[in-house]
Amino acid sequence: MIRSQGIKGNGDRYDMSEMGCRYRRGVMILPSMCDSDSKLSIPAAFDMFQNMATLHADHFDIGPAGMSRRNYFWVITRIVMHFERMPSMMDMTEMMTWIQPADRAKSERDFALYSGDEKLFEGRSIWAVMSHETGRLVPMAGLFPDHIDFDEPAPELPLSKIGKDFEGCEEIGTYTIRSVDIDLGGHMNNVNYIRAMLGCFSSEKIRELNIKDMEVQFVSQSYEGSTLTFRCRRPDDGTLEIGALNEEGKAVFLARLS
């Protein structure tokens, strides 16, 4: 199939195979996106990816407006990211996102950030669709157009499991969920778990951790007014595993950092 590239008036670029699996957009790293070292922060990197996913989905009428008409909403269940380096404040970058074929209950969306030809970070994510009315998962069938050419491979980043049992593990902080943490699903936004988790550490400690790989799993929803307790453990492989536990002591969010 011959592929051409479309360019919209706002600078969006996307591969055209009757609207291909890829979507690209230039992104300047603004001050509000940066950490204390004037580099793109990890939460802002996750925000960038989610925003790109929304823009791409909107081309298929499964962005916020299209899903609202169906009374559905997207949820991310897992993300794994590898960081080579973070861009600096006011750098111009280009982000690309692309999708893999969906199965019955979930779909994979991948992403990468570039500075010219240099890949700065990349990731994989697993998504599902839920019904506002029932609160249950919705089958993926029919959401994506049949004519998409899925020809972009996923990054070579394994998706693993993180154990939910943090009994007796070190407590590193607590966080009470506020109104500003809530998204259109009525629960805590995914990226705000990451912000709350990293907020358990000082800027100096985050610098010392020098995070190159991060895997997160969103286990269940949390709501305004609830308090999360963050606990950590260090497996023999040298990684740092963190769990956010609700007031019943059950893990709602899991992360592995290295």
Regions found by a protein language model. Give the residues of each.
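Exposed loop/turn and edge beta-strand positions of beta-sandwich/beta-sheet ligand-binding modules
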Residues: T77, S107, K212
